Amino acid sequence: MTKKRLLYWLFVVFMVLALVLSAIPIIASDLFRQPYSPMWPHIRRAMDLFRIDPFPVGGGAPPRWPFWREPADAFVYHRDLTLTTSDGVNLTAWYVPAHEPGAPTFLLTHGLLDSKWTMLRLAPWLQEAGYNVLLLDFRGHGGSDHQPASIGPDEVQDVQAAIDWLEAEGVGEQVIGLGMSLGAAALVNTAVQDDRIDALILDSLFADWSDTDFAEGYRLPPDWLVPGVPSPEDLLPLIDIPVFIIHGTADVLTKVDHAHRLYNAANEPKRIWINDSGHGWSAWTYPELHQELVLDFLDQSGLTPLD
């Protein structure tokens, strides 16, 4: 091979490598911000059916079962909803009404790569405690339109669409947001700009996306691949409603120090519960204690159903 030909092929290899490297952020962003192909809900259901969790983070947690596909499986009456956001995204949701009128409403928001039916186990006891419950599929999740996730900011429109519907139905006077991970971030982002949320229960929330360590669990993009993610640690001081922070010491996706940072940033009244569960597992690892602490928090916050 002549020197000229060698230089030619070296140039070709260099250009190919340059193109590949330049495409990595785009490809990674597409994979991680849009991991929601039409097949994903079916894959996620199969994982639950065979007891495979996408976040195997330990903590001695029992499985998140019984496996309920629909609210009817949980023995609760519900309405199937389709909501439309201000930017035209169609969302699917379930509404579980309280047994008595005039009750506060729980808005349950799931984590990344999950859907409303993974939050379904909370609905029966919340209804029995006297609350309405709305379970929402974020954009790109469950039965909602397959739009990219934004780790908080774009999901604000999803949360607001849910609250708009609650107000139109006359059950949005008192709204309690209970979110896990991505769902908690969306609630915080919403509460900063929308005063229709009366209390926040934040489970496994990151204080700052760029400080999370996902290397030991499910691989998600680093901060430089997901720019513009607001820091809940910076947003909480702007919120003047009761906040309950929940986290597990076995969470390897968002380490427990994030919970302490969030608690320090939040205004009073605030509460924190640290246990030994994994990412988003507190309600399943300690269901009775979780219920007790949530209801006590709401009692102290003046958000209990009327007798």
List each language-model region with its residue ranges:
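Alpha/beta-hydrolase active-site loop
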Residues: 118, 149-170
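Catalytic histidine neighborhood in serine/cysteine hydrolases
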Residues: 264-282
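Conserved alpha/beta-hydrolase
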Residues: 126-145
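Short beta-strand/loop motif that positions the catalytic acidic residue
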Residues: 238-240, 245-247, 251
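The serine-hydrolase catalytic nucleophile loop
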Residues: 112-125, 138
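An N-terminal hydrophobic leader/cap segment in hydrolases
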Residues: 18-83
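Hydrolase active-site cap/lid region
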Residues: 50, 184-241, 274, 284
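Post-His helix in hydrolase/transferase enzymes
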Residues: 283-296
